[in-house]
């Protein structure tokens, strides 16, 4: 009798198992999950002043870091947002990055 109860209890526990939680930070909006990323990207740097050849050769793009939720990604662009309205599909603090500018993308873990 004891083995039967133990077996049944284990069977119920396996049946009632919760879905595996993601180890990545995300938000669900209108049944769609958006993951949080740290995006490192190269930004254009400009200067309208006079410079020597030595100064000009040391002139490099700025390496920027953005923390945001990824809205979409395709062959040309990555679209992100940082703010949203709960319970509705409204996004703000939006950016569109050309794929060529992105140096690195990392999913943020919990």
Locate predicted features.
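Conserved RNA-binding domains used in RNP assembly and mRNA/RNA metabolism
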Residues: 15-110
């Amino acid at each position: 009798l004891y083995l039967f109860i133990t077996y049944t209890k284990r069977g119920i526990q396996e049946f009632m198992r919760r879905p595996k939680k993601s180890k990545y930070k995300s938000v669900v909006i209108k049944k769609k999950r958006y993951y949080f990323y740290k995006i490192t990207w190269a930004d254009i740097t400009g200067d309208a002043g006079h410079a020597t050849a030595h100064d000009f050769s040391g002139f490099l793009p700025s390496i920027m870091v953005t923390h945001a939720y990824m809205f979409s990604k395709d062959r040309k662009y990555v679209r992100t947002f940082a703010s949203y309205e709960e319970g509705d599909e409204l996004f703000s603090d939006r950016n569109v990055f050309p794929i060529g500018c992105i140096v690195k993308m990392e999913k943020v873990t919990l």
